[in-house]
């Protein structure tokens, strides 16, 4: 059996959820969209089912997968509905919906739901991606109330730069939201992962922890006690001696500065490890750090074993996890941890805890 695998620590997931809820102080929807950021939505939701106040997913199909897996807590559709027929499924499966644009208001106007809808009304407070502008928010809220088809309305927004504590954008968005919603009743939800950890003023009724659940800290240089949930690992499957000056791999991107003992590892970019990382990117072999050498290929990558004389065939190689933070690999690849985690595929997933 190929040794490439993703080890998912469900105890760490629960730890991170409790940390998020404790830091925020209110209720928390665990965000498990995009297959729980690549970790397995059904497995992660089941692991949190006894603790979570609810879950958030992207769209209806993701919610139905959770219901089929036995999840009966509230589930919020962050993108809302796309067509009138979806409202029947929303009611049938007791789902909550975000309303963030006029077409969704029109869908509700023309619907005849069997039960009142639970709506989260989204304001565009400055991210300019989704939501009603400040002057549109009260009319949208009133239209929902007057429809007679809505039960509760939670007011929400989303921050563009909560993971940048030195910039004013989050404060400006907070001010815009509070000004626009001052006279409107109902619960509020503002805090994403960055705001949970770094912006206490954004702590209201509901938090929406996402990336922090999976142990990738969104805040720079601030140890927050998160535990990595995924360890991406494989093993050394061959060892080769590379003479000083000899090239290695596609494009001869690496030339040995000295006689080099190279370990071939059964994992590549088809498994989700980024091709863009440079020579020198850290890996851990049997818990000891060394470096990537040569270009990452589809199924394989190569590491430097020269200074690890005890390492060899079968040695465990951690690409990210407890020894190698996924944020470090994301930085090397000039991307974000979200993308790396969501892209893990083809490897064997093993769950513990």
UniProtKB/Swiss-Prot annotation:
Top-tier EC class: isomerase
Record InterPro entries: Ala_racemase, Ala_racemase/Decarboxylase_C, Ala_racemase_C, Ala_racemase_N, Ala_racemase_pyridoxalP-BS, PLP-binding_barrel
A Gene Ontology biological process term: D-alanine biosynthetic process
Gene Ontology, cellular component aspect: cytosol
Pathway: Amino-acid biosynthesis; D-alanine biosynthesis; D-alanine from L-alanine: step 1/1
Family (UniProt): Belongs to the alanine racemase family.
The protein's name in its UniProt record: Alanine racemase
């Amino acid at each position: 059996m190929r040794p490439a695998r993703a080890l998912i620590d469900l105890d760490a997931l629960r730890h991170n959820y409790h940390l998020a809820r404790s830091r925020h102080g209110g209720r928390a929807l665990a965000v498990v969209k995009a297959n729980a950021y690549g970790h397995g939505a059904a497995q992660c939701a089941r692991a949190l089912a006894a603790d979570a106040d609810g879950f958030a997913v992207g769209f209806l199909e993701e919610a139905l997968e959770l219901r089929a897996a036995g999840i009966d807590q509230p589930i919020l559709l962050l993108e809302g509905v796309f067509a009138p027929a979806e409202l029947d499924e929303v009611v049938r499966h007791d789902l909550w919906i975000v309303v963030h644009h006029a077409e969704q208001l029109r869908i509700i106007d023309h619907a005849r739901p069997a039960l009142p809808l639970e709506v989260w009304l989204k304001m565009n407070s400055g991210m300019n991606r989704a939501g009603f502008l400040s002057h549109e928010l009260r009319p949208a809220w009133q239209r929902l109330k007057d429809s007679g088809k809505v039960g509760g309305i939670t007011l929400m927004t989303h921050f563009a730069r909560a993971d940048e504590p030195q910039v004013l954008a989050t404060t400006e968005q907070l001010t815009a939201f509070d000004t626009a919603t001052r006279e409107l009743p109902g619960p509020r939800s503002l805090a994403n992962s960055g705001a949970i950890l770094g912006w206490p003023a954004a702590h209201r009724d509901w938090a929406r922890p996402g990336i922090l659940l999976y142990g990738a800290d969104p805040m720079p240089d601030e140890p927050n006690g998160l535990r990595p949930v995924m360890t991406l690992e494989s093993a050394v499957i061959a060892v080769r001696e590379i003479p000083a000056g000899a090239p290695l791999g596609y494009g001869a991107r690496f030339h040995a500065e000295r006689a080099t003992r190279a370990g071939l590892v059964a994992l590549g970019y088809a498994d989700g490890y980024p091709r863009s990382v440079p020579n020198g990117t850290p890996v851990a072999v049997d818990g000891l750090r060394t470096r990537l050498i040569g270009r990452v290929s589809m199924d394989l990558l190569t590491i430097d074993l020269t200074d690890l004389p005890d390492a060899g065939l079968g040695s465990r190689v951690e690409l990210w996890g407890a020894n190698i933070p996924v944020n470090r690999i994301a930085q090397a690849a000039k991307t974000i941890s979200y993308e790396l985690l969501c892209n893990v595929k083809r490897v064997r997933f093993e769950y513990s805890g």
